[in-house]
Amino acid sequence: MALLPDKEKLLRNFLRCANWEEKYLYIIELGQRLPELRDEDKSPQNSIQGCQSQVWIVMRQNAQGIIELHGDSDAAIVKGLIAVVFILYDQMTPQDIVNFDVRPWFEKMALTQHLTPSRSQGLEAMIRAIRAKAAALS
């Protein structure tokens, strides 16, 4: 995740954007920074249901118990939203993920109020899937 900013810098950068067009472009840029997901990880078991776009999220726990998230989408804005979610969950254990509510961060960024209903539903589906996988590991 070295290519992505931390939570605080994400929020600062997001709030510096002058309008929603700039914010969308920033979200897309974040998605472009995600490492490429391996083809074998683009499997039905890693597919997130509830998203209009194709979304894959892979969760692995490293030797220190920290969750490493990897993901991809066939839609640029959705891939950027994946990056935002990954930034918020960065360096967390499974229990940290279960306990952490990302919604206040979305409110600070005024993120969900400018997403279409289908993108908001997809974002919620991603969060539910990550939290469910984390709960199974904790």
Swiss-Prot record:
Its main location: cytoplasm. GO terms for cellular component: cytoplasm. Keywords: Cytoplasm. GO terms for biological process: iron-sulfur cluster assembly; sulfur compound metabolic process. The active site is at C51 (cysteine persulfide intermediate). InterPro entries: Cysteine_desulfuration_SufE, Fe-S_metab-assoc_dom. It is found in: Cytoplasm. Homodimer. Interacts with SufS. Belongs to the SufE family. This is Cysteine desulfuration protein SufE. It comes from Escherichia coli O1:K1 / APEC. The lineage of its organism: Bacteria, Pseudomonadati, Pseudomonadota, Gammaproteobacteria, Enterobacterales. The gene is sufE.
